[in-house]
Amino acid sequence: MSKIKAISLFSSAGIGELLLNNTNVDVVAANELLPKRADCYKHFYPNTDMHCGDITLDETKEYMIASAKKHGAKMLIATPPCQGLSTLGKNKKQIHYEKDKRNYLILSAFDVIDNCDFDYILIENVPTFLDMYFPYEDDYFKLEEILNKRYADKYVVEARVLNAKDYGICQSRPRAIIKLYKHGLKWAWPVSEEEIPLQDAIGHLPSLESGESSDIPWHFAKVHNDRTVLALKHTPTGKSAIANEVYYPKKEDGTRIKGFHNTFKRMQWDQPCPTRTTFSGSMSSHNNVHPGRLLPDGTYSDARVLTLLETFIVSSIPENVDFPKDSTDTFIRTVIGESIPPKLMMKVIEKIGESVQLCQ
């Protein structure tokens, strides 16, 4: 069976597409604004036509439309930045209409959709994306409303929030999934699975302290400052060092660092990993510290954030992934934090062609 050709907009580094080779979809062209991310995408997918440019510009849209037509692309994958209005106020009709639609990048995808004949369209983002309001026809609407107004005659429009932890991924990471597919075609939702606790996912890897490395690729610990390491050594699994009475996070001058209850916090072994954000390399950010294990001296091991290997595993990224040689730890963590876990993308896309009844 021939593969469905697809184009990808707002593709970033292509993390979300890493497992699409296991599906019936082949991404033939992609667009990304930022050169470093576009270069990483080209590194991962040398056979895909990556166009680095601004999708709000006519020339970029025209390039992607031409590429879609050239390759006979029948699918669009779009992961636009989450931009919109979170509230409208009481007098929605009186709100000034944004004349510059470039502030709402998802609307730029409409020009591509209108000029191509896609069978399937996948739009994914953070859950709040479904609650945002966007300017349309001199008013403001949620995206699902706009899609129905514009495309209901041609497409079935469905939207759900799926959490990666329910689909074979050891990470609690909710993502908004919007599917459009032509009337007469089929596209089921993926079937939920048992949660995977962190122990089962990364518990086999050797313990590491701040700055230590191993002979396992990507399994090396970031260097953290001694004050924070000391505080976390005295912080049990699942707890935050912020709550410690003696060994709490301190500034250089010794004063206590104030923070939320989920900062400087260790994860739980018996639960999926918390969401990996773009700040997963910082112990001071939310829920980022390795669970650790109780040591004979009463302290806890692994006073550090997850290694890149551990981050790959809980993000469903292949352990043998080959990032460009000049990729920094921060860059890798950032593009992972921006992306849908690739296994969740795969699970959604592999249901193309299946009827809804099969997965109920």
What are these model-derived regions, one by one?
Residues 13, 140, 175, 338-346:
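Short alpha-helical patches at coil-to-helix transitions and adjacent helical residues
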Residues 65-70, 85-263:
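Class I S-adenosyl-L-methionine
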Residues 226-360:
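C-terminal target-recognition/interaction regions appended to catalytic cores
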Residues 14, 35, 81-83, 127-129, ...:
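Short, solvent-exposed loop/turn segments at secondary-structure junctions
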Residues 2-116, 126-134, 138-140, 145:
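Core alpha/beta nucleotide-donor-binding catalytic domains of modification enzymes
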Residues 9, 30, 102, 136, ...:
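Aromatic-acidic/polar surface patches that form glycan- and anion
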